[in-house]
Amino acid sequence: TLLDVGSGPATISLALAQKLKNVYALDYSTEMLNYANENAKANGIENARFICGDASDAAFQLEKEGLKPDCVILDPPRKGCGEELVKTISRMSPSRVVYVSCDPATLARDLKFFTENGYTPKEITPCDMFSGTSHVESVALIERN
């Protein structure tokens, strides 16, 4: 089971859906999740659930429902995840978290929150997606201790 937080049109999670039991995609944009739903239907993907709303609130609700994902993908806006979302995800106990960040400062802050909640960053890969600018994307692999 995969939880995709900040999924946008769920490109990553839908690409993996056929190899997974269930996919939960969270995003604040109804428009993006409509695209995700259309994409799932067009590709015959029936094991995906799309949830619109604030990431922290939606993740907390899924935790209350008993969701225990094997892996979480995080792709937050520039402000990062924040402590409450990290705590909620940590309580769900995924073995791995893949964090896609567009801000090294908020990534560093959120990695600190993960380490305080039983996780260890294993690998961080910077990606120059916007050549010639100061912007850098980073992908961090975080594992439960």
Language-model-detected regions and their locations in the chain:
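Rossmann-like S-adenosyl-L-methionine
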Residues: 1-145
